[in-house]
Amino acid sequence: MNDINLRQAIIQRVYDKSNEELTDVIESSIGADERALPGLGVLFEMIWLESEPAQQQAMVGSLHAKIQKQTPVQAE
């Protein structure tokens, strides 16, 4: 049996998906169990690596704005 890492497993899971199916994978992962977070991270990494610096900065700006609207949970 071939050993595959997490990135490879996630890419394999979505490899032949249509745009609609890929949208479903993303939307069903958002807000789901935390086990879905690594998959979203791999997909985001793929987008990031193929983005121009201006697009990356736009994503960072959008993310920063969303983070600032959140209320941090205080550790007990």
Where are these regions (language model features)?
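Short alpha-helix boundary/capping elements
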Residues: 18, 34, 52-55, 67-68
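Secretory-pathway low-complexity, repetitive Gly/Ala/Ser/Pro-rich segments with frequent Tyr
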Residues: 20-24, 38, 57
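Short acidic alpha-helix initiation/capping motifs at coil-to-helix transition points
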Residues: 1-5, 34-40
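Charged low-complexity stretches with an acidic bias
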Residues: 4, 56-76
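Short, charge-rich amphipathic interface segments used for partner binding and complex assembly
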Residues: 39-64
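Alpha-solenoid HEAT/Armadillo repeat architecture
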Residues: 15, 30, 48-52
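N-terminal acidic leader/helix
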Residues: 1-28
